[in-house]
């Protein structure tokens, strides 16, 4: 059973990972979609569409990876329990 300290540590790691993902997504999508020489104070329609697609792809990949890692982790846990029972 997880203690409060362990749960707090897990929550802290989740926040850190989400912050890192957000930072990487922001940097990657900005570099890809927004020109370094600003001509207008607002985003152009093309920039806005590019950012929307970039963020959507980033989040989609993040979700798919999370599901895949969870299933792999559960498979590993089941295998370890099976070995421990033998």
UniProtKB/Swiss-Prot annotation:
Keywords associated with the record: Chaperone, Disulfide bond, Membrane, Metal-binding, Mitochondrion, Mitochondrion inner membrane, Protein transport, Translocation, Transport, Zinc
Keyword GTP-binding: no
Record carries keyword Protein transport: yes
Motif stretch (Twin CX3C motif): 29-54
One GO MF term attached to the UniProt entry: metal ion binding
One GO CC term, this protein: mitochondrial inner membrane
Highest taxon in the source lineage: Eukaryota
Topological category with respect to the lipid bilayer: Peripheral membrane protein
Transmembrane segments: none
Pfam families found in the cross-reference section: zf-Tim10_DDP
GO biological-process terms attached to the record: protein insertion into mitochondrial inner membrane; regulation of multicellular organism growth
Record's subcellular location: Mitochondrion inner membrane
Disulfide bonding pattern of the chain: 29-54, 33-50
Similarity section: Belongs to the small Tim family.
Stated role: Mitochondrial intermembrane chaperone that participates in the import and insertion of multi-pass transmembrane proteins into the mitochondrial inner membrane. May also be required for the transfer of beta-barrel precursors from the TOM complex to the sorting and assembly machinery (SAM complex) of the outer membrane. Acts as a chaperone-like protein that protects the hydrophobic precursors from aggregation and guide them through the mitochondrial intermembrane space.
Domain comment as written in the entry: The twin CX3C motif contains 4 conserved Cys residues that form 2 disulfide bonds in the mitochondrial intermembrane space. However, during the transit of tim-10/tin-10 from cytoplasm into mitochondrion, the Cys residues probably coordinate zinc, thereby preventing folding and allowing its transfer across mitochondrial outer membrane.
Complex formation: Heterohexamer; composed of 3 copies of tim-9/tin-9.1 and 3 copies of tim-10/tin-10, named soluble 70 kDa complex. The complex associates with the tim-22 component of the TIM22 complex. Interacts with multi-pass transmembrane proteins in transit.
Protein name as catalogued: Mitochondrial import inner membrane translocase subunit Tim10
Phylogenetic classification of the source organism: Eukaryota, Metazoa, Ecdysozoa, Nematoda, Chromadorea
